[in-house]
Each structure stands twice: as C-alpha cells, then as structure tokens.
Amino acid sequence: MAKAARKKFSTSSDPTGSTVSAEKHLNSVFKFNTNLGQHILKNPLVAQGIVDKAGIKPSDIVLEVGPGTGNLTVRILEQARKVIASEMDPRMAAELTKRVHGTPNQKKLDILLGDFIKTELPYFDVCISNTPYQISSPLVFKLLNQPRPPRVSILMFQREFAMRLLARPGDSLYCRLSANVQMWANVTHIMKVSKNNFRPPPQVESSVVRIEVKVPRPNIDFNEWDGLLRICFVRKNKTIAAGFKSNNILDILEKNYKTFLSTANAAANGDDSMMVDDKSSMTDIVKAKIEQVLTETGFSDKRAAKLDQTDFLKLLYAFHQVGLHFA
C-alpha cells in the first residue's frame, strides 16, 4: 500500500472551553470544504456522548479520522493515552494544532496529514470518526481489514449508510455492505444526529454506530468472502444463478481455476506442469462446476437479498470444494 505524506504535530485542549470561539475564528479565516466532507460537529453534548460510548481506557491509543477543528479530539485526549488524528486538509491540521498548543495534553496528539485511505496506519485500540461521507465504505473496510483491527469503532455516517450497516436479510437496505461487515463485526446503532448539529449543516441526517470486531476473528479469507459477495450482490434481487452468467465473472473464475490447477499439480508433481484445455472446453468446465454447486446447495434460484451469513458460507465452501475461488 502506498504511503501518504505523513507529518506529526505535538498538541491537545480544554474539552469544554473553546468550541464556539474556535468555530468563529475558522469562519473568519476560511470556508469549510464540503467536497471533503467538512461538516463540523458543533453540539458539545453530542460530541461528549460519542466519546463516552467508545469506552476509552486510560491505556488506549485512539485513531480519529477527520478531526476538523477538534471538538471531538479535545474530549478524546482527556480519556486516552494518545490520539492519532488523520486529517487531509492542512488548514484544519494547523488550526487543531493551535487549539491544543500549550495545554496539558499537548504531547498526547499526533496528526497524520494526508489521505486516510492511502495512509499506512500505526497500531491503535479504538477508532472514532465524524466520517466524511464520501469515504464511508472504504473507511469501514480499511478498519476491518487491519492486521489488528480496533477493539471498537464509534463512527458517524449518513443515516442511510448507517442503516445499511445494520440491515438484515430481507430488509430493503440489505446489501453487500451489510453481509460483509456483519461477518467480521457486531454493529449497533448508538444515536441519531440531526443535521442542525453541524456547521455547515449537511443535506442529510446522520447516525452514530458502534462496530465491535468479533473475537476470535472468523477463519475466512477476507478477499475470498468479499469476492463471492461482489458477484452475488451485483443484482441482489436476481437469482444467484443469474449473477454467475456474466462473461466477466466467468473469465475471472476461469483464470482463478487455472491458477488453482497449476498450484495443485505443482504440489503433486514437484513442478509447474499441467494439462491446459483449450479456451472453450475450460469455460465449459467452469460453467459445469458452477451449475453443480448451485444445484447441490439449492441456491440456484435463491436471491442474495434473502441470504444470511450461514448461506453464503455454505456457498463459499461448496465452490472451494470444486476448485473455484474468488480472489
């Protein structure tokens, strides 16, 4: 993964004192960039509620994504051993540094300046974020796919996105995101947050969710699981069989099957030799295996919108048994 530019500042602040004055100062200096999702949480009660729900321990390192002017940051600093704030806008990073300069918690804050999605993250125990809406999905998957995922994440999202995280099979909002996240973590709704609690106010309402990773972590390859779900949820209300008829999907599965055969033959024979059928016959083999799996599992006429984790696990296992892989 490419490393984003990384810069550290030493910093912290009075959690109750400078919220209003800091915002007035910022408004006089520059305009918030809503294209970067800069909607600053201005309600101190909501900010404190979010931090309290994280259950921060005095020994915890907390990652905050999109700290903005620091209304959450200063409260986190009061409870955590260290705060790592990931901020893309240099202006915000500078203002946050000023806000906490000279305070007792000054040395507890590091700021990572750059694109969060491209940044290689250090170890952290907890994540808190007033999430820029355009990175909601990448942020969730990046957190869950960390070598050592955070114990808990308290994340603010657009209301509809939050409801997708919580959706169950059969719900109208149930989708690949729902099935994927719920495999790796338990998700609960914490609170609704009105758009009037932000400056400038966004066009939509928000919700805060709590994501706690499952322990032990499911013994499943993340990319294999995600690869299967991508195919099944391309058209979630169509049959599973219909999703596997795409030429692009067949090409991917055929390529992966050839790799599987090559690896299996090399392990058995001590070399890379294998019999490679012509294109048409290999495609027919893959199609036949797909039909076999869907028929034997009984999922051919099922729809992804109605399937739960157990169903998808059965499907993934059956495909692996015939040598078909998704990553």
Curated annotation (Swiss-Prot):
GO terms for molecular function: 18S rRNA (adenine(1779)-N(6)/adenine(1780)-N(6))-dimethyltransferase activity; RNA binding. GO terms for cellular component: nucleolus; preribosome, small subunit precursor. SUPFAM superfamilies: S-adenosyl-L-methionine-dependent methyltransferases. GO terms for biological process: maturation of SSU-rRNA from tricistronic rRNA transcript (SSU-rRNA, 5.8S rRNA, LSU-rRNA). Residues 10-20 have a biased composition (Polar residues). S-adenosyl-L-methionine binds at residues 39, 41, 66, 87, 115, 130. Keywords: Methyltransferase, RNA-binding, rRNA processing, S-adenosyl-L-methionine, Transferase. Its EC number is 2.1.1.183. Signal peptide: none annotated. It is an enzyme of class 2 (transferase). It catalyses: adenosine(1779)/adenosine(1780) in 18S rRNA + 4 S-adenosyl-L-methionine = N(6)-dimethyladenosine(1779)/N(6)-dimethyladenosine(1780) in 18S rRNA + 4 S-adenosyl-L-homocysteine + 4 H(+). The keyword Repressor does not apply. Residues 1-20 are annotated as: Disordered. PANTHER family: DIMETHYLADENOSINE TRANSFERASE (PTHR11727), DIMETHYLADENOSINE TRANSFERASE-RELATED (PTHR11727:SF7). Belongs to the class I-like SAM-binding methyltransferase superfamily. rRNA adenine N(6)-methyltransferase family. Specifically dimethylates two adjacent adenosines in the loop of a conserved hairpin near the 3'-end of 18S rRNA in the 40S particle. This is Dimethyladenosine transferase. It comes from Debaryomyces hansenii (strain ATCC 36239 / CBS 767 / BCRC 21394 / JCM 1990 / NBRC 0083 / IGC 2968) (Yeast).
